[in-house]
Amino acid sequence: MSFSVDVLANIAIELQRGIGHQDRFQRLITTLRQVLECDASALLRYDSRQFIPLAIDGLAKDVLGRRFALEGHPRLEAIARAGDVVRFPADSELPDPYDGLIPGQESLKVHACVGLPLFAGQNLIGALTLDGMQPDQFDVFSDEELRLIAALAAGALSNALLIEQLESQNMMPGDATPFEAVKQTQMIGLSPGMTQLKKEIEIVAASDLNVLISGETGTGKELVAKAIHEASPRAVNPLVYLNCAALPESVAESELFGHVKGAFTGAISNRSGKFEMADNGTLFLDEIGELSLALQAKLLRVLQYGDIQRVGDDRSLRVDVRVLAATNRDLREEVLAGRFRADLFHRLSVFPLSVPPLRERGDDVILLAGYFCEQCRLRLGLSRVVLSAGARNLLQHYRFPGNVRELEHAIHRAVVLARATRNGDEVILEAQHFAFPEVTLPPPEAAAVPVVKQNLREATEAFQRETIRQALAQNHHNWAACARMLETDVANLHRLAKRLGMKD
C-alpha cells in the first residue's frame, strides 16, 4: 500500500478545515488513523523532557491528562533522540507507553509501534505515534511515506507554536485558545469552564492588576495563581505564598510586613515580611477571608500607597508587589456581614476569577485521573497504571465534594490497594478500589430482542452480521476501529466476517 496524492491532499485539507489548533490536531489524528488503519494514534507536544498529548484517537480519554516524562518511557525517549522514523519491533523490550490504554484491549500489549519525531528546523517540537495490535501492521508503509506524514504534522504544530508565541507577545490580535494554555502543564482540562478560565488567565497575566481567585476548597486556586505569575512580566521574580488561615493573630502582622529587633518578645533580629520577599514579584495570599479586620486595614494601605512598615519601626519601605488573593468564601456576603472590608474587596477584585468545581467539569475528571495515575506510576516504579471502564464510569458519576484534591487522594489510595492485590508491576484500577460513598450509576441500556422464526444458529449469525455492519458504518469501514468497538481481535473479526459471507 502507498499513499496517493489524494490521500495526502485529504490530510492537508483536514488541517485547513479545523477551527482552531485543537480542532485541526484532532482532524489530523482521526484522518491518519483511518488512512493507516491503525488502532491508535496520538499527536504529542515536546516540552521540558516530557511529551504532552494534544490530540488522540483510539486511546482512552485519560491519556490526554497524562504527562509522559522521557525518564519513565524509554520508547518515547528513543523517538525524541531519533532524527527520523522509528519502528519498534513486535518483540521490543522497551515497554509501550500505551499498553493497557487502548479501550477494549486493556489486557493486551501493543504489538506494532511507529514513532515520528516532529521538528521545526533543528528543534524537536513534538511527535506522532502510531500503534496497532498486529505485529506487521505498518510494514506496508515506507519510511518515505511516513516522513511525508511527519512533515505535514510538523508544519501544523510549528505554525500553532508560532501563533502562540506571537499572541503571548501581543503581536497579533485574538483571544487565547485551549492549545496556548498547554504551557500551564498542571492546569489540565478541556471543559468549557476550564477553557474560559485559561483564556482569562492569559488576558490578566500580562497586566499588573490584582486578582481575586474564588472557588471551593480543592479546586486548584494555587495553581491558577502560579499560572498567572508564570505568564506575567514578573515571572523572573519570586512568587511568595502565604496561607492566611494558618496565621496566628499574634504573628500575622510580622509575617506580612516584617519586624525589627526588639519589636516584641522573641524578636531577636530584624526580619523581612512576605511583602519585602515578594518585591518586584507576586504575593499570593491564600484564604484571605480569614484575615482580621485590623490586618485588612493595613493590607489596604499597602495596596493603595505601595509602602509598608515593619512591626516596631516608624520608617516606611517602598515595595512593588502584585497581589493575588484566593478564597473559598463568598466575600460579597462577608462584606454584607461586616467581616470583610468593602474597600479592600474592591481593591482585590479588579479582575475576579472563578475556578469551577470538579463536578461541573465533565470529562476533565478522567483527564485528571490519568495525570494522577501517571504520577503514581513514576513514584512507585510501576510499569503501568490503567483505569478500567468501571473505574472511569464511577469517577464520572461521583460528585467529588473535595474536588481535585479529593480525586488525587482517591487515585493514590486506589493504586496502593490495587497494587497489594496483584503480583508484578502492572496495576489496573477497578471500581472496588475506590472508597466513595454510594454512587448511583446509570443502568445499562437494554436492547430490544426481536422474536424471529429462525433456528438458533441462523439467528445468531444474523445478529452478528447486523452488529458488524453497524460497527463498520460507525467507523467508516475501518476494520481495526470496528474490532476495537466490538472488543475483539481484528484478525478474529476478519475470520468471522469471512465465515458470515461478508468478506471474500
Swiss-Prot record:
Is Nucleotide-binding included in the keywords of this UniProt record?
A: yes
Show the Gene3D superfamilies listed in the entry: 1.10.8.60, 3.30.450.40, Homeodomain-like, P-loop containing nucleotide triphosphate hydrolases
What top-level branch of life does the organism fall under? Bacteria
Checking SMART domains in the record gives: AAA, GAF
Where does the Sigma-54 factor interaction domain lie? 187-416
As stated in the Swiss-Prot or TrEMBL entry, residues carrying the post-translational modification 4-aspartylphosphate are 57
The membrane spanning regions, by residue number, are none
Q: Which spans of this chain does the record mark as coiled coil?
A: none
| Keyword terms | ATP-binding, DNA-binding, Nucleotide-binding, Phosphoprotein, Transcription, Transcription regulation
Question: What are the DNA-binding region positions?
Answer: 479-498
GO biological process terms held by the UniProt record: phosphorelay signal transduction system
Report the InterPro entries cross-referenced here. AAA+_ATPase, GAF, GAF-like_dom_sf, Homeodomain-like_sf, NorR, P-loop_NTPase, Sigma_54_int, Sigma_54_int_dom_ATP-bd_1
Any idea what job this protein has?
Required for the expression of anaerobic nitric oxide (NO) reductase, acts as a transcriptional activator for at least the norVW operon. Activation also requires sigma-54.
NCBIfam families per UniProt: PRK05022.1
The protein's name is Anaerobic nitric oxide reductase transcription regulator NorR
Q: Native species of this protein?
A: Escherichia coli (strain ATCC 8739 / DSM 1576 / NBRC 3972 / NCIMB 8545 / WDCM 00012 / Crooks)
